């Protein structure tokens, strides 16, 4: 029966029931069973003759029969029996219940000890330990009888061990293992409660009481006595607190936020009158503990990040104020005694061990992780991105301080790496931005800073800032800093329309040769720089170089992974922590639709004339350029029965290519210019004007390739009118085509017409081309039949010659193609493979 019906329901009693354990619950249930059995007996003894008298006897009927008598109508006469039931109930608190359980466990341990049943003793002692943990969690303290049990058990185990050594009779293996485990656990508990154990041995009468021994006075005496250092010296209260926090750092079941609060209170108390050494030590410990508190989260909470940023600024303020006395540097020597100040150097400055660079790097990493875990299309991301200004200001300020604390003779070496790391961090914040944003960031960063930098002067132009930082990094030890400086510079110049400088830096450095053995972050930066170089070449009008730079990476199936912008081959939930941290925040991404649009436009301008030339030439004179990528898109479009108006970027470019094949450059330009993504590029009008000129030129070339087998003469004036370009430019284009051997023609004496002449390779009709293809296939079929007839040993001369020719062609083009080959980042195991 439910307890709700037994004792009634009350909101207050129900809430108290959560904290109380009723020791007479079994009695209550037994009383219910007795009453229920009485009802059952009465029910069993009833017969049909008594049923008519049930109402007159006052016995319940129907559902009311199963209610307790206290709930029946007219049950007030049973008040005496109810009061007797209430008198038998004993309600104990959770503390009393837990104490009884612990006493039972102690008795079980003592009983097993007397019987030398060490397996049972170990089991009961472990149960007693779990109960003790519960008592500590609920704030009940350590019972006195537990300390008694612990001391007695320790003494008995020592005595048993001594007797066991003297005795010839040994324990069996199971008892011996249990006995050894029990000794270890008892020893650990004695060490943990050493102060209570010592107190019990000295004053056992204090433990005769039921309540735990009041150790407040003892604790106060212990706290009043300063802690000792490793050399036996007494620690001050400040360093005693710091040492206690440091000793518990990293351990389980430690409330890190409580440690943060302790350090914050300590800093507030010590700041007005404490020594600089104490205050600096508190600042460094507080920053580290705050970072530890959020180490198990995906990112640091915003309020904690803001507090750490303010604390780091306060630390730099304090260090700058006492720069003639104390410095924090990675060059400082650590000591086991946290309260000992290091000796002063020749300048009278004490170098404290620490790292301003590491604190700034960690703060910046937490900022990036917050952005990575925020929806980039939300207002929260935009609001959070505003904090980048504060982060960059802190990076510049930290660089100035590290410059002052890093001697000149260690710069460029491994010992001075702290300066190189923070300069690298500064470059990482500005290399992808246009000059206007860099200038705004620099002016804001230097507004509240005094002094100047030896690496980059104050109020320098954006170009000088990038060049100065890159020059400093290029002189550092290790491969990551020179390569990073070079790729940062290439990316910056490419973004800011300085294509020629970016291209010369990229090619002259030969950075592509060892990129597959570089760090993953450098590989991602390399791919980003190469893509930005291709986009810059397109804006500059170098279509072929842009196509060459973007060709491999745009056709890759792992485009997002190569650029550090996501995953193509796996779900984000399947990625490791290292792979996720390698990703860039959204505001640093390269627009992949823009990349695809630029690459396909370059393919259109290059491959459409090649397709026209190949369709009207002999096989021997066709160009070796691979034109399958764009040709497959056109063939797929031609196989469609119904094609609607263009919608996507790809549709616009395919329709534009079809128009260009027909010589309709104007319609091709109209289709390309309606693509809205061009507005993302700077100088949009100049870009469209450049595309217009390229379409006119390539349209003219396509027209000549298409109709050279039909016409014997073409008018220069007519061509100039069709393609809306002047006659001099038409003559220049045709002259280049003639001199390069693309067409067999000549210009008339008056330069007014183009005369096509028959070449040594006769122009063939479509039927002739199909006949030649059929002849080649028949030859291959004949070779296959001969090979089958001779048990697989047919003629191989032709095949070997073809393979040799293909090998020579690959060797010739390998050196040229590898210049713009992307770094293949292997995200599965963070190893890097070279593309074959």
Swiss-Prot record:
The lineage of its organism: Eukaryota, Fungi, Dikarya, Ascomycota, Saccharomycotina. Keywords: Cytoplasm, Initiation factor, Protein biosynthesis. The gene is NIP1. Residues 1-97, 783-817 are annotated as: Disordered. It is found in: Cytoplasm. It comes from Meyerozyma guilliermondii (strain ATCC 6260 / CBS 566 / DSM 6381 / JCM 1539 / NBRC 10279 / NRRL Y-324). PROSITE patterns: PCI. InterPro entries: EIF3C, EIF3C_N_dom, PCI_dom, WH_DNA-bd_sf. Belongs to the eIF-3 subunit C family. Component of the eukaryotic translation initiation factor 3 (eIF-3) complex, which is involved in protein synthesis of a specialized repertoire of mRNAs and, together with other initiation factors, stimulates binding of mRNA and methionyl-tRNAi to the 40S ribosome. The eIF-3 complex specifically targets and initiates translation of a subset of mRNAs involved in cell proliferation. This is Eukaryotic translation initiation factor 3 subunit C. GO terms for cellular component: cytoplasmic stress granule; eukaryotic 43S preinitiation complex; eukaryotic 48S preinitiation complex; eukaryotic translation initiation factor 3 complex, eIF3e; eukaryotic translation initiation factor 3 complex, eIF3m; multi-eIF complex; proteasome regulatory particle, lid subcomplex. One of its GO terms (biological process) is formation of cytoplasmic translation initiation complex. Residues 586-761 form the PCI domain.
